[in-house]
């Protein structure tokens, strides 16, 4: 899970309080947010680098994508982590794995940083994970077999296991260090509710594409919680070819969901992922929710081989009742007009034309 925000005049949200009601212990609609304006950070790239980028522009019919350096991304997460580490805090887990730097810290909340980028805060991680999991799990009839691609912290897994119909879950994550942390650090184990010790769970420490190249039984639900497409390598996780491959692992009435960044801060990335899934031959439904610790809303795409599977999902009541989703899912499928307009600019990300990481860097620059 992954979360990157746009840096230009970014608005940082801090949760100051929340109200409880009988239905919801933590209701995202009732957060009182304190909004703080942060001034722009100066980009110190020299002029020659800028000229080189201009020479490498990627053209599409409606959009010009200019490659930018990734060091300009996610400055606020790095600043936040430094401030935490400089003050009173508890380091719950710290390791440089073969793939990333992992920092699990505790102040008032528990926060996971991967390569200095915030992945979740325990204050509101349920908002993200319930939105990722429950719409699809509630819509697919009696899901028995579930595949989770990514999600090594076990938080999406926790939500999946709430469904009594589920008999078998395969979780695929590349980083064994993440899995070990999620299994053994008490604060994370408390968050994921011992999910990795459920007898229904099978963990596969390998690359998702490697797993998808192996024969397997079909799945009723597939949950894609890949990192954001910040690099060309990560962009390969969001190609039409890979989405088409994932679709072959679905049962006739199965569906998958893909985390897809922010339709507010990265609309070109968000809608391009949806467009790429559609080009793989699937029916797509798009939705989003506000995640306060991310400082923005976050978007997802549902997809299926059979259009009827997602019929009237907006009118769905979710059971088991999540703590943070509205009782009726309809609001999640509504977008502001300015966000919908960006849909017309959506691109196709394919193995022969990897462009999503360039869209991403362009939208995330400051």
From Swiss-Prot:
One Pfam family name is Spermine_synth
Does the record's keyword annotation contain Transferase? Answer: yes
This protein's GO cellular component annotations are: cytoplasm
Q: Which SUPFAM superfamilies match?
A: S-adenosyl-L-methionine-dependent methyltransferases
Q: Which residues bind S-methyl-5'-thioadenosine?
A: 100, 173, 207-208
The active site consists of 225
Instruction: Answer yes or no on keyword Cytoplasm.
Output: yes
The record describes its quaternary structure and partners as:
Homodimer or homotetramer.
Q: Which protein, by its recorded name, is this? A: Polyamine aminopropyltransferase 2
Per the UniProt record, the source organism is Bacillus cereus (strain ATCC 14579 / DSM 31 / CCUG 7414 / JCM 2152 / NBRC 15305 / NCIMB 9373 / NCTC 2599 / NRRL B-3711)
Taxonomic path = Bacteria, Bacillati, Bacillota, Bacilli, Bacillales
